[in-house]
Design a protein with these regions (language model features):
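His/Asp/Glu-enriched, well-ordered alpha-helical/loop segment
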Residues: 213-226, 232, 244-339, 343-346
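Histidine-rich, glycine-flanked metal-binding segment
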Residues: 1-31
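Active-site core of metal-dependent hydrolases
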Residues: 138-265, 284
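Divalent-metal coordination cores built from histidine and acidic residues
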Residues: 62-147
Length: 381
């Protein structure tokens, strides 16, 4: 039962007198999806040159992703010049402070860089990758004003372990990613306080039976949560299913979406880099063909996991409760009394039917919530 912006009750039995009750048939009601790794969507991206520009872009991005079931997200910046990152973090903080109750929550910032391995840059601009700096961390923390949620770092870089320790002490979730780290170096990062891995399998050494690398280190450590880009492109569906089976309570479905999400094929930007969308695949426009984010949305991520053989409840958890826990969003990711009324309604085939944020309908293209059969309170059997 939804009462204003919160869920007031969950369970079976007759409704209270005066309650509006909807018969949704065989449709599924689930917590709203939470995306920890999203760079853009609907034609806008997170990185920007003015605080207000960034704030407006982040809010527009969140509203686009709400049309695909995302009710909260962590706005993710790519590596950039120091002053641009500081501006971007300030803009994300401004977006996070917006109070529109019908707008998806911006939970804070995820910095994917700049302290990454140049050899594993992927679609990060190599020009902006640099050595870890405590001074830069301090400036970013000050700019974020308590909204810096995650930082991705390559733990083998000089000074990385000190950054991990300082950031964790400040309440930031430190994530291993874009790295050449071996198994032991990854475990050392975990010992220093890192508790997350950015897009497992991508931009890191693969899993090998004699060189297990960061993939095995993460899956073997029950303290560690792992992101999976569940588009069937970044990771083969069989490997998605394997990772989910290995860490069903620790896997996090993410989109890694860029500005092109929701748009037609063509050329777009990821930070300063030119990228090309063709079909569902985004790659750097230059000849390497390196994957450059995605046009994935969270509703499709859940459906992709289920199609790969992941149990529905496990797939939903990876898009809701687990990312909520990583982001410290205790009122989100669950259907329980007192939780935020962030809800998605899915068709039996998992197509999104409606999105509710804070008790307000923000997406209902088929007018389901207007047309669903009403059951008069007290008359349901």
């Amino acid at each position: 039962m939804i009462d204003g912006p919160r869920i007031s009750a969950v369970g079976a039995g007759p409704p209270a007198a005066g309650q509006r009750v909807l018969n949704l048939g065989r449709r599924l009601v689930a917590p709203g999806f939470i995306d920890l790794h999203v760079h853009g969507g609907g034609g806008v991206q997170v990185n920007g040159t003015s605080v207000q520009e960034v704030a407006e872009s982040v809010i527009a991005m969140a509203r686009f992703h709400a049309t695909h079931g995302t009710t909260a997200l962590v706005a993710t910046a790519v590596s950039d010049a120091r002053d641009i990152l500081i501006t971007t973090v300030r803009g994300i903080a401004r977006a996070a402070a917006q109070t529109d109750p019908g707008s998806p929550a911006v939970l804070g910032a995820h910095l994917e860089g700049p302290w990454l391995a140049p050899s594993r840059a992927g679609a990060q601009n190599p020009r902006h990758l640099r050595e870890p700096s405590i001074d830069e961390l301090r400036d970013l923390l000050d700019a974020a004003a308590g909204t810096l949620r995650l930082i991705t770092i390559a733990p083998e870089r000089p000074g990385a372990l000190a950054i991990i320790e300082k950031a964790v002490a400040a309440g930031v979730v430190m994530s291993v990613g874009h790295t050449e780290a071996d198994f032991d170096t990854t475990r050392t990062a975990f010992a220093a306080g890192a508790r997350h891995v950015t897009h497992l399998f991508n931009a890191m050494p693969g899993l090998h039976h004699r060189q297990p690398g960061p993939v095995a280190a993460a899956l073997a450590d029950t303290r560690i949560t792992v992101e999976l880009i569940a588009d069937g492109i970044h990771i083969h569906p069989a490997v998605l299913a394997l990772a989910m089976a290995a860490a069903p309570d620790r896997a996090v479905a993410v989109t890694d979406a860029i500005s092109a999400a929701g748009l037609k094929d063509g050329h777009y930007r990821l930070g300063e880099l030119d990228v090309k969308l063709a079909g569902r695949r985004v790659s750097l426009a230059e000849a390497s063909g390196t994957l450059a984010g995605s046009v994935l949305t969270m509703d499709t991520a859940v459906a992709t996991l289920v199609a790969a053989g992941v149990p529905l409840a496990v797939a939903i958890r990876a898009a809701t409760a687990t990312p909520a826990s990583v982001a410290g969003a205790s009122s989100k990711g669950r259907l329980a009394p007192g939780a935020d009324a962030d809800v998605v309604i899915l068709e039996p085939d998992l197509r999104l039917a409606a999105t509710i944020v804070g008790g307000r309908v923000v997406h209902d293209p088929g007018r389901l919530l207007d047309s669903a059969a009403l059951i008069e309170a007290g008359s349901a059997s």
